[in-house]
């Protein structure tokens, strides 16, 4: 699992990016967020996640808010 910080997340569109120190930003889709109900992330929030290979490159999976 990697740790990072939410760079930005557009709740209306359901996606954003997670910043990982010393690495490229990682795309995150709302469906990858592990929580019940409304799934969203806040800018600056710390998260833990796995990186998987998506259609357009690396993306976050199993995202957990810290």
From Swiss-Prot:
It is found in: Cytoplasm. Its main location: cytoplasm. CDD domains: CSP_CDS (cd04458). Pfam families: CSD (PF00313). Residues 1-66 form the CSD domain. PROSITE patterns: CSD_1 (PS00352), CSD_2 (PS51857). The keyword Cytoplasm applies. Coiled coil: none annotated. One of its GO terms (molecular function) is nucleic acid binding. One of its GO terms (cellular component) is cytoplasm. Keywords: Cytoplasm. PANTHER family: COLD SHOCK DOMAIN CONTAINING PROTEINS. Involved in cold stress response. This is Cold shock protein CspA. It comes from Staphylococcus saprophyticus subsp. saprophyticus (strain ATCC 15305 / DSM 20229 / NCIMB 8711 / NCTC 7292 / S-41). The gene is cspA.
